[in-house]
Amino acid sequence: MASSADVYVFGDQSTPVLDKLQALVRVKDNALLTSFLGEAFLAVRREIVSLSSLERKSIPEAESLSLLLEGVRRSEPHAALDSAFVCIYEIGYYIDYLARSDKQHPPAAPSLLLGICTGSIAAAAVSCAKDVFEISRLGVEAATVAFRLGMHVRRRAENLGYSTPSSWSMILSSNQEELVSEALKEFSKEKNLTYSSRPYISATGPGFTTISGPPSILESVKSCDTFSGKRLYPAPIYGPYHNSSSYSESSLEHGLASILEDVGFLENEMLIPIISCASGSRLDQLSFGNLLKNVLSSALSQQIRMDLVTDALVETVSGTEATLIPVNAQTTVCSLADWLAKRGATTRIGPTLESLTKDRAEPNLAPGDENKIAIIGFSGRFPEADNLDEFWDLLIRGLDVHKPVPEERFARDHYDPTGQRKNTSQVQYGCWLKSAGYFDTQFFHMSPKEAMQTDPAQRLALLTAYEALEMAGVVPDRTPSTQRNRVGVYYGTTSNDWGEVNSSQDVDTYYIPGANRAFIPGRVNYFFKFTGPSIAVDTACSSSLAAINLAITSLKNRDCDTAIAGGTNVMTNPDNFAGLDRGHFLSRTGNCKAFDDGADGYCRADGIGTLILKRLPDAIADSDPIFGVILGAHTNHSAESVSITRPLADAQEYLFKKLLNETGIHPHDVSYVEMHGTGTQAGDAVEMRSVLNSFAFDHSRPRDKSLYLGSVKANVGHAESASGVLAIIKVLLMMQKNTIPPHCGIKTKINQGFPKDLDHRGVRIALKDSVDWSRPEGGKRRVLVNNFSAAGGNTSLLLEDGPAVHPARQHQDGDARTEHVVAVSARSTKALEENLKALEAYIANSWAPEGELLSQLSYTTTARRVHHSRRVAFVTNGLDDLRKSLLKAATDAGQVKGIPAVSPKVGFLFTGQGAQETAMAIGYYKSFSSFRSDIHQLDSIATLQGLPSVLPLIHGTTPVEDLSAVVVQLGTCIIQISLARFWISLGITPQYVIGHSLGEYAALQIAGVLSVNDAIFLCGHRAALLDKKCTAYTHGMVAVKAAADDLRQHISSDLKVEIACVNGAEDTVLSGPNADIESLCGKLTQAGYKLHKLEIPFAFHSSQVDPILDDLEELASQVGFHEPKLPIVSPLLRTLLTGDTLGPQYIRRHCRETVDFLGAIKMAESQGIMDRSGMCIEIGAHPILTRMVKSIIGQDFRCLASLRRKEDHFKTLADSLCALHLAGFSVNWDEYHRDFASSRNVLQLPKYSWQLANYWMQYKYSWCLTKGDAPVENGPVGAVVQARALRLSDSVHNVIEQVHGDKRSSITVESDMHDPSLLAIAQNHRVNGLTMAPSTLFADIAFTLAKHLIQNHGLDTHTNLPSINNMAVEKALIVGETGPQLFRASLDMDWTTMRGSVRIFSVGANGKQTTLHAVCDVAVENPSSHRESWQSNAYLIQRGIKQLVQGASDGSAHMMRRGLLYKIFSNSVQYGSAFQGIEQVWFDSEGLEGTGKVFMPSGKDTFALNPYCCDSLGHITGFIMNCSDSLDLDDHVYINHGWRTLRLVEPYQCDVQYQTYVKMQAVGSDDSTYSGDVHVLRDGKIIGICGGVTFKKVARKVLEMLLPKPSGAKAKHGVVKHVAPEPVKHVVLTPPSTTSHSVGTTSPPEPTESPVGSASGLIQKALEIIADEIGVDISQLTDTTLLADLGVDSLMSLTILGNFREELDLDIPAAQFYEFSTVQDLKSFLGANDQDFSSSNSEAESSASSAASTSPSDHGDDVVEEVKPVVAEIPRSTSTILQGTKHCSQTLFLFPDGAGSATSYVTLPSISSDMRVIGLNSPYLTKPHEFNCALQDITGSYLNEVRRRQPQGPYHLAGWSAGGVSAFDAARQLVSEGEVVESLILIDSPNPVGLGKLPKRMYDFLEKSGIFGAFEMGEEAQAPPDWLFQHFCVFIEALDRYVPEPFEHGMAPKTTIIWAADGVCKNPDDPRPEAQPDDPRGMNWLLNNREDFGPNGWDEFIGAGNISTMAIENANHFTMMREPIASALCAKIRETMGVN
């Protein structure tokens, strides 16, 4: 029997593989295949990312091979992807073929491989693979090579001018090679084709010939006589393959070298011979590298000769039975079999993969690096440690940081040592974060209001995630593994403390997203825009390690490429302490006593930890820092335990051994175990047993391989859901520090239940001192981290050291760059300053070599940092210089402005002649591989055209003056094209180009007009024509500093001198014969002109070039001119070039005519292409054009250089990149650093300098202790529950809250201005007709609060008396006509300083501040010290009083009595009799000095500091200032602005005679401000001083504007009904903690209001609205503040705009508001519109205007509802004014669609200037989880809000989508109640009957299509909050249940239905979800084009006669709501409502 041989035939890209490769991807039972396909995709993706940004645009983005295949299917063919897909498919096919057949690899029987074209690459990988596993590894390398080959061919096609993919080959079904060859030669000659355009024969064989060439040429070939009538089939080959004329030997060698660069396994030897498809020869005994060179050379430059292949196979298989096995080559194999059979060979065709039916055998993959996970960054917050350094410090010092529960968490009354009281615990200790509430709201774009409601765990997860990413140097989208859609977030979290006890006390908008645990990872995803998995894990104590385990699994399964993983635990809920204590988990004596014999439970702890994880190969490829490597992680459960909470040794032991076995690690190679170690008797014993059984089961462990045990819980407690990640971070720090810290858990003696032979087993515990733990030489340390859960779960993780030397830097040279860019950025000025100082300090403390440190600093701060809006950057060559620059920049940080929202325009300027030099661009050539590759590629094109190589110009081997014009000019062009490409590769893409003279060739190429091939052809052959037809140096050019018009007057007719270039207003170049030039130069010199002769051989743009023009035009006719891809500014035509103006004639004129650079730049400036804010980069040897451009546009126009003479190119490049970065461009820093491997080390620089403030919502009143108690006995349901109030005085009516501690105390009180005692004060004090509280009332309140706290603190009130200092009245407290009118006061007292601060403010119905009235300070002082010092000066005061009294007698002073005095006073202040305490006054009008007698009769009041008396004692100052004839008082008054100090040695009393004295003195040089000290005397002794009483001059008109008219007083406050006083809670604080109540420290006082009728008043009001809405002090709204940084998102913007319309009558379109990026932008707009505002606000606005976005408390409704029994009430709907103001004549109400928010309508343009448009919000908008009622049930809530806005009809209602159904139901209810609905508008609202619920696949489709779920905000689409989508889902549920009721006959309103004409999938080829049988009607209605524009079922409910319909063309359901179609919609609405 004849022997057999297998011939595997690998096909080329002519056979489609997309579907077949997709089928392979779906194979799930071949692990090796799956692994190969995944790795091959990653390899291809790395190649894609390495391309320039321009090249990447042609490749669809995808996160998997499957998605990439789908993307390619919908896009144009791509040669690189085609080539790679063929290779991947064929290798995958071969792998799967082996698994499904009986074949082996290497094959047992004789075998051959045959690869056709690109199929040879796959064949090469198979040939050189030693086993099936190596096929996968070599296959990945082959895929890389195939992609590069295809990219090489694509670039050649583009260089030839063919960028649009079309077929480059067609097959003639006959073998007539000679005939075809002759025909093609004749064709090329006839068409005058250049070599690169000529068609050629690329393949021949029995029965076929393949003709290849440019697509447009092939089309012409078809019409040749030779091929007329013959069948030519196009082949899917998209580039010039198999073309020998395209390559010289050197260019081919260079091309192969670039393709094979860094390819692995090149030394592998062939195991299976290959038949060459080019020669038919047998290839064997070659290395993989040489084999690839052979097959690549064949694919690029050699014909396919299937005739020779057939000959070779006949010879090879002779005498054997050959089996031809097709691998993507079924057609080829059939043809081969036929050809062989005709030659007598015996062959058969083997089975295909599809025909095999054997079961698949799944190979086991050997463990390797691809299964390892690198930890590349980590961060955390730890008990008593805010950063990693502090954490390590407490570890190494062996500290135990447990402490009592801080007061800010919960009160001490939750502790009960007896354990008898309900809900208490006997535990009083924990381990606590120092700064749990601190957060940087501006950085994370979160408003303080939202931050306050957001769980600190969420906020700290954000902070630590950013820090860990920064540590890792992760820049999103930098590499394939950091694409945003490939980053997953996994956090373990088990408690919900914040939502349970803190934010639940005041449930508001952000309660759900702020408190729900799922938002912890979700918040990280959302902020960073990571769209990978977002998963919260709860496995109790092991949550964080379980989350990390899940992240590792996701990485291995390629669900993501980068994982952010960790855990959080912030304890605020006392119930958890109580529950764990009563469950016997917790220690009552302190911290976790791990390994101690007296272990009695665990100590609870806070903790946050975050890790950044990647697959190890990805981390190495990305040059990431690697701090540790995870070998494996697993989780199981102790299900067999006796109790669910009791750990099981067997389960843990199984887990440990499973890890060791799977990772191949010997137990003795593990040197440290980080134990769970909670310090419980059961847990410690079980864990020790399982660890010893696994790692030290006997005494065989070598002495030099000790096993150390430890537990971080002994230091920082048990952080529960964060405990695992904290343990890992401890281990990572140990690896960094090479030290095992001491274990502090053993307080008495080691657990006696542990085995006694630990020492013999080699087990150690570092007890007192730290232990050296250095990495073994050439080895790795390995660690087990163990974590188990109270719920029975066990998770363990095995990790080891990372690579000792990063593989990317193993074979590195030093960084050759002499100058480096170092960048620093921040999001705020203060952060920028601190970042700069921190970096300087880091450098100062570094010991690294200067060159290495500088290089790596540059890499880290540019390529590995996210760059923020405030930027500074430096170009430096030394550390000293850099440190000085950093400190200088820190000082000047306040001057740094944010980068513009849109980067400025940038253009490329291409220099002309005259700048060339020897060794031009040599620095770039040597330093940057991409530039060097482009030079070689372009040079090879030139040499193939018969032109000389330009490399001598670059290498500098020949001086430039000795080089030919061809080399110089062509070299300039090639260098410029390469430089431009280099800039583009750095991320700088030009928006326009300008070429000066010679430079225009490169400009035309970069703009896409000329292919690279044609640009080289024209430029090179033009220069050759010059050499041939012109004589060098017979003509010259001279630059003259003069205007062209002036020079024309000097050029006589006998001189053949012409103007060659007009470079500027006084910058002109002349050209002509040398003699004429010399003659003219003499004249010009005599005339005083400055000139400079240019050293060039030829004078372009002169008569010298006339001989070449015809030939040049003929050459130009041979090339193709394409439409420009970007604007080209033409100096020839002084206009923008278009396809019509470009052609051979243009090239001719360009050579000969004048270069009007001046005219071109002016034109570009006039058309907005160039402007002063823009930038340009000069592409040339020296920035010659820069000077010209600046002289035309202005010196501030920024021009950057690529090269400068006599300047290191590194400095030039660095300077330019630095400038671009600072201008806001996203520089591709990775590309900049790519060629400098030694720099690619991520330094561990100081972390970002957060600007933190404390956002803490205090848990109050210990209400957890009373949960479940019977309610306090109430009266009838709904009655007010009157709790006993604590009234301190007649000014302090009710104590709301007081907290007393050793170091701090605080109190908050509430009073009613309509209480008789306070109302009397205000009614006796009227200013400008307004009833107003005096400032002395505020002083009394402050005095009262201070005395109360002094008494409660146990101090003697006789020796500790408060002084009231720095009183500042911010806004008058005006009393309304009706009450109650509540205001509050708070005092925070610091007993360490005996100082406190007071705030007095009005409150709304919800108890929240509405207006701040006054602030002051309190100081507790001993009055005796004042009495002594005052008495020493009393004689001076008494002498002054005496002189004034005597002066009244001698005429030098005046005396006045009470009646006249207060009558004069009444001009400004009307005092009632109760305030008229002055009996007599003596005063010196000119000296502003006075004294008075004051007597106040006694009353029944209980004031601490009687305001009547206090005010009267101060009247002397007001009288002196406003009754003086020495001051200008005709048009001005002097207003009291507070005082500096008010000190008493005894309280004021009634029925006592006082004497007052004051002398007022000017402050400053003018009369605007006066100040004085009021002395109060009793019986001649000073008993009080009011110091620094200040009056300021105010115009009477301004005063009238500042103070509202009395008629408006009615609206000055909200009417608040009485509520039950809250019980007073006394909280005892344990030192040294303090109580934190609010944001940061005391808020600064609010600024005084500006007049509202002015621009500044408008701005002030607007800023107050914004500040109030986002919850910040108005002082934070600085001009440079970014609104987005404050959390002003789309939803908040809607509310703010509504408030503007309601309170300010200011209508700003939403789209315009979104354009305001900073506060200054808004202020500029408001300043420009102040006139409109002023005219519409003639009356002063109320200080308590109702908010535009309303809530229940805004309505003044009785808040007693809070104590009603809980019933299923519908929450109130809210609304926002979207358009118009209250003055509009009509109002249109828009009902929300399914999302529930009015934001759906914000994109509508103005409907009418006379229409107010109000958008309603769903009552369940932010709490969709509560939406469980019917749709018609919420209609009443909507109507309540409609009636609040418009109490009576007629009404106009409308709604889009599902909102139309709500509008219909509302209209029906209104009509049934007798109201008039004038119009109902249904905007593309389907009839709800039978609509059906949309399936999730529909949502996914809409979201993926970018249709659903994005809200346009400015130019950026922002995703809405998660609850918006949740609301949509629950609303659709309600809509599905809704059964509409028809209107009663004759009652339906006029109804208009406006339909969109199109479906979402308008065109047949539009993507659409796959149809399913259960697709609901609503789904088809959305997707398909509409055909019926009638009522569509609505007539059943409204009546056909009441309905009119309209349709909007070219609009679908979604696009109709956005511009430009929204304008058409608004026009339809106007038409319907009959408005203009």
Curated annotation (Swiss-Prot):
Residues 1293-1425 are annotated as: N-terminal hotdog fold. One of its GO terms (molecular function) is 3-oxoacyl-[acyl-carrier-protein] synthase activity. The active site is at C541, H676, H718, S997, H1325, D1511, S1857. Residues 1452-1600 are annotated as: C-terminal hotdog fold. Residues 1628-1654, 1733-1758 are annotated as: Disordered. CDD domains: PKS. Residues 370-801 form the Ketosynthase family 3 (KS3) domain. Keywords: Acyltransferase, Phosphopantetheine, Phosphoprotein, Transferase. GO terms for biological process: fatty acid biosynthetic process; phenol-containing compound biosynthetic process; polyketide biosynthetic process; toxin biosynthetic process. Its EC number is 2.3.1.-. Residues 908-1209 are annotated as: Acyl/malonyl transferases. The modification O-(pantetheine 4'-phosphoryl)serine is found at S1690. Residues 1293-1600 form the PKS/mFAS DH domain. InterPro entries: AB_hydrolase_fold, Ac_transferase_dom_sf, ACP-like_sf, Acyl_transferase_dom, Acyl_Trfase/lysoPLipase, Ketoacyl_synth_AS, Ketoacyl_synth_C, Ketoacyl_synth_N. Residues 1638-1654, 1734-1753 have a biased composition (Low complexity). The keyword Acyltransferase applies. Residues 1653-1730 form the Carrier domain. Residues 1295-1599 are annotated as: Product template (PT) domain. Coiled coil: none annotated. Induction: Expression is repressed during the growth phase, but is induced as the growth rate decreases due to nitrogen depletion of the culture medium. Highly expressed only under acidic culture conditions. Also induced by salt starvation. Expression is repressed by regulatory gene, areA, a transcriptional regulator responsible for the activation of nitrogen assimilation genes. Expression is also negatively regulated by vel1. Polyketide synthase; part of the gene cluster that mediates the biosynthesis of bikaverin, a red pigment also considered as a mycotoxin. The first stage is catalyzed by the polyketide synthase bik1, which catalyzes the formation of the intermediate SMA76a also knowm as pre-bikaverin. FAD-dependent monooxygenase bik2 might then be responsible for the oxidation of pre-bikaverin to oxo-pre-bikaverin which is in turn methylated by the O-methyltransferase bik3 to me-oxo-pre-bikaverin. PANTHER family: CONIDIAL PIGMENT POLYKETIDE SYNTHASE ALB1 (PTHR43775:SF45), FATTY ACID SYNTHASE (PTHR43775). Multidomain protein; including a starter unit:ACP transacylase (SAT) that selects the starter unit; a ketosynthase (KS) that catalyzes repeated decarboxylative condensation to elongate the polyketide back- bone; a malonyl-CoA:ACP transacylase (MAT) that selects and transfers the extender unit malonyl-CoA; a product template (PT) domain that controls the immediate cyclization regioselectivity of the reactive polyketide backbone; and an acyl-carrier protein (ACP) that serves as the tether of the growing and completed polyketide via its phosphopantetheinyl arm. This is Bikaverin polyketide synthase bik1. It comes from Gibberella fujikuroi (strain CBS 195.34 / IMI 58289 / NRRL A-6831) (Bakanae and foot rot disease fungus). The gene is bik1.
